[in-house]
UniProtKB/Swiss-Prot annotation:
CDD domains: Mth938. Belongs to the AAMDC family. GO terms for biological process: positive regulation of fat cell differentiation. It comes from Bos taurus (Bovine). InterPro entries: AAMDC, MTH938-like_sf, NDUFAF3/AAMDC. It is found in: Cytoplasm. The gene is AAMDC. Disulfide bonds: none annotated. May play a role in preadipocyte differentiation and adipogenesis. This is Mth938 domain-containing protein. Residues 6-122 are annotated as: MTH138-like domain.
Length: 122
């Protein structure tokens, strides 16, 4: 199963190929996507993305995980989350969201099992 491309991105809105849903923040993996609801894990801009935020995507068997920190990079990614991913053997890319989407789509079109978590506002 391939990773769906992100079809569009604008402030507060993301569309994923194969889905009719418009996401504010989303998780994407080979074969699917869904809302990234920060309330599920108590996530806030700081301390930021926690292992619990990426665990679902990791469990889908991704080789690379792309994290979009927001348009202004307000969302933090603590070293503990990066270490968690590295210990799982996953290459992690942490970028501003527009750059993260470009990176994710480039990897997806190459057929790489890539996943992502993306924050589409600040």
């Amino acid at each position: 199963m391939s990773s769906p491309e992100i079809a569009s991105l604008s402030w507060g809105q993301m569309k994923v190929q194969g889905s009719t849903k418009i996401y504010k923040d989303c998780k994407v993996w080979p074969g699917g996507s869904r809302d990234w609801d920060w309330r599920e894990t108590g996530t806030e801009h700081s301390p930021g993305v926690q292992p619990a935020d990426v665990e679902e995507v990791v469990e889908k068997g991704v080789q690379i995980l792309v994290i979009g920190r927001g348009m202004s990079e307000a969302l933090k990614v603590p070293p503990s989350t990066v270490e968690y991913l590295k210990k799982k053997g996953i290459d992690v890319r942490v970028l501003q969201t527009e750059q993260a989407v470009k990176e994710y789509n480039a990897l997806a079109t190459q057929g790489i099992r890539v996943g992502g978590v993306f924050h589409s506002t600040c």
